[in-house]
Structure formats: structure tokens, C-alpha cells
């Protein structure tokens, strides 16, 4: 399966309130798959990370169709990765006037799609 990376189109969701480690677990399942196959996988996986990834994947496909004129049926997930974003810091009160810091991680999800080249 050959992919034309020169016509690669991507979409990015930034500051998603989720751990990048948990998002990567789902992204590993769809990387290299066709657009339709990735949609089906994300629809039926039980993880919370699937919703924002599904949104980004649909956005990338819409960008490919609208901006580049590509057909959704030929698209393949060429890249899918999650980078860490800034952590939100919250404080939890503890005994005797102390406070512990709670870090709430965020991440940036990037999904790139490219058309599959049919070899003749």
C-alpha cells in the first residue's frame, strides 16, 4: 500500500483535557489504516479518547475533500500522534494547612490523511 505524502492534509485539536499517554494508545490502533476502517474502529472502542480523535479525523477528511479535492474513499491515516500540552495546576487541601498540587494534563492531537496510490 503506497501513500502519496505530497498531498497529505492534516487537522490539529489543541488543548484537549486528556493525558497524551492515554490518547496515544488509541492513535496507535488507527495509524496506517484507511479512513473508513479508522472510523469504524473509533466508533466501537470503549475509550474516552475516541471522541476527540474521531472529531479530528473527520476534520482532516473534510479538509482533504474541501481544500485539496480528494475523495474520502481513497484516504489513509498517514500520521497520527499526540503531543503533550500545558498542564493545568490545581491544589487539593490537605491536613494541617498543607496543599498538594494536582496536575491535569492536556494534549494536542494531530491526524494527517493522504490519498492511497493504486499501483497498476
From Swiss-Prot:
It comes from the Bacteria. Keywords: Ribonucleoprotein, Ribosomal protein, RNA-binding, rRNA-binding. Pfam families: Ribosomal_L22. One of its GO terms (cellular component) is cytosolic large ribosomal subunit. GO terms for biological process: translation. PANTHER family: CHLOROPLAST 50S RIBOSOMAL PROTEIN L22-RELATED, LARGE RIBOSOMAL SUBUNIT PROTEIN UL22M. This is Large ribosomal subunit protein uL22. The lineage of its organism: Bacteria, Bacillati, Cyanobacteriota, Cyanophyceae, Oscillatoriophycideae.
Amino acid at each position: 500500500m503506497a501513500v502519496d505524502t505530497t498531498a497529505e492534509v492534516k487537522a490539529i485539536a489543541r488543548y484537549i483535557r486528556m493525558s497524551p499517554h492515554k490518547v496515544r494508545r488509541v492513535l496507535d490502533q488507527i495509524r496506517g489504516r484507511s479512513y473508513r476502517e479508522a472510523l469504524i474502529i473509533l466508533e466501537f472502542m470503549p475509550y474516552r479518547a475516541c471522541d476527540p480523535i474521531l472529531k479530528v479525523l473527520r476534520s482532516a477528511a473534510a479538509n482533504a475533500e474541501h481544500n485539496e479535492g480528494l475523495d474520502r474513499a481513497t484516504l489513509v491515516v498517514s500520521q497520527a500522534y499526540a503531543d503533550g500540552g500545558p498542564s493545568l495546576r490545581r491544589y487539593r487541601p490537605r491536613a494541617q494547612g498543607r496543599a498538594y498540587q494536582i496536575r491535569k494534563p492536556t494534549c494536542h492531537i494531530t491526524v494527517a490523511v493522504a490519498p492511497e496510490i493504486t499501483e497498476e
